[in-house]
């Protein structure tokens, strides 16, 4: 120990090199290995290699731990998706499962009569208030100028209908916007069908509106019946007046013998005859059969 204290730094380095070369030649046999905490031992003691080696103390006990051979994988930061994005993905997958392609998803609102100063940002700001937009664009002509039309595609059809009801004929930069939903009827309720029905005697002919079924028809005051509910078979009584079917009543119209002061002395002539359910069903079937013969 005293010899090491009297040696200079160069001599100590030279001696350590010679000891390491001798240990390498001997293969490290018979040399014990001391290990500390982790890769570096306590008090700077570093264990030898797999074949062992001399124990270094003092100033030369430098932590010569090699650089790590593995890299730390940074955790990939997952992009958080919004709840409505997951719902839209599920909605598109459902439509594809039933045979509807992804291009067909969404409802397009076609907008015309726009001022040339309207921009895409104006369209987005205005129509995004209604619901989620899939895409939006202003149309341009061949010269690159706005053509006065645009289209907005909503993810939900209900939003497109609401946008049409809210912004149709509304002024934007002094011009009323004209909106149209592409690819389907936009009416909330279907229009009643109108057919021409010929009466049983071949002389009576009128237009009948078939709606979504109010039970019990009604004949109005005019020659034609109004569009309120399903019209049941028109019948003729013995006095020539016109009566309605199940639950209906006869009006004051111009039916034969149906006016005021007829032979029966009442406003409607003879009262309708009570019929059973089977008779009414039979009359209804005959009415439908006659309705098919549209003249």
From Swiss-Prot:
Keyword match Nucleus: yes
CDD domains: RRM_THOC4
Gene3D superfamilies registered for this protein in UniProt: 3.30.70.330
Subcellular location field: Nucleus, Nucleoplasm; Nucleus, Nucleolus
Entry-linked SMART domains: FoP_duplication (SM01218), RRM (SM00360)
Biased composition annotated in UniProt, kind: Basic and acidic residues: 11-22, 271-288
A Pfam family annotated for this UniProt entry: RRM_1
Domain annotation RRM: ranges: 107-184
GO cellular component assignments: mitochondrion; nucleolus; nucleoplasm; nucleus
InterPro entries (alphabetical): ALYREF_mRNA_export, FoP_C, Nucleotide-bd_a/b_plait_sf, RBD_domain_sf, RRM_dom
MF terms (GO), sorted A to Z: mRNA binding
Keyword set includes Nucleotide-binding: no
Domain of life: Eukaryota
N-acetylserine found at: 2
BP GO annotations: mRNA transport; rRNA processing
Gly residues bias locations: 38-55, 213-227, 242-267
Similarity comment text for this entry: Belongs to the ALYREF family.
Protein task: Export adapter involved in nuclear export of spliced and unspliced mRNA.
Quaternary structure and interacting proteins, as annotated: Interacts with PARP1.
UniProt-recorded name of the protein: THO complex subunit 4C
Gene: ALY3
